[in-house]
Curated annotation (Swiss-Prot):
EC number: 1.7.2.-
Domain Globin: 2-142
Site (Homodimerization): K123
Record gene name: NSHB5
Compartments where located: Cytoplasm; Nucleus
Enzyme class: oxidoreductase
Gene3D superfamilies listed in its UniProt record: Globins
Entry keyword annotation includes Transferase: no
Co-factor(s): heme b
Lineage: Eukaryota, Viridiplantae, Streptophyta, Embryophyta, Tracheophyta
Protein family per UniProt: Belongs to the plant globin family.
Subunit structure comment from the entry: Homodimer.
Name under which the protein is recorded: Anaerobic nitrite reductase NSHB5
SUPFAM superfamilies: Globin-like
Species for this entry: Oryza sativa subsp. japonica (Rice)
Length: 145
């Protein structure tokens, strides 16, 4: 299944609504990842030795992913970015299971951020966008390994 224009519109419309609070939403997203899988904290080089009190909202890497779409206004990812993401994920030792953790955290975070917009169609749109991105990153991980 491809990413349809309707799905792209749902993702972009919900992102428009969330981007004004993207830093706070990014913080909630990362905290949700660590709630689901505490060991995931070790995947982030800037968090490895940080203890329990991590000021994620002040760290640019924590919010970088959530703000890229705001800056570009586009859901497409450049090939060079995918290569970098693949290499970074291989270096960090990211396993397939973590992609599901991130997907769950992403969907939970979006649902909480835009409850008035949330619907089965929006969930499906974000799932499709994430699944395509995750598949592309995994493909680049295979090449980088």
């Amino acid at each position: 299944m491809g990413f349809s224009e309707t799905q792209e519109e749902l993702v972009l419309r919900s992102w428009q609504s969330m981007k004004k609070d993207s830093e706070s939403i990014a913080l909630k997203f990362f905290l949700r990842i660590f709630e689901i899988a505490p060991a995931a904290k070790q995947m982030f080089s800037f968090l490895r030795d940080s203890g329990d009190d991590v000021p994620l909202e002040n760290h640019p890497k924590a919010c970088e992913s959530a703000t890229q779409l705001r800056k570009t206004g586009d859901v497409k990812v450049r090939e060079a970015t995918l290569r970098r993401l693949g290499a970074t994920h291989v270096k960090a030792g990211v396993a397939d299971a973590y992609f599901e953790v991130v997907k769950t955290a992403l969907l939970d975070t979006i649902k909480d951020a835009v409850p008035e917009m949330w619907s089965p169609e929006m969930k499906g749109a974000w799932e499709e966008a994430y699944d395509q991105l995750a598949a592309a990153i995994k493909e680049e991980m295979k090449k980088a390994a």
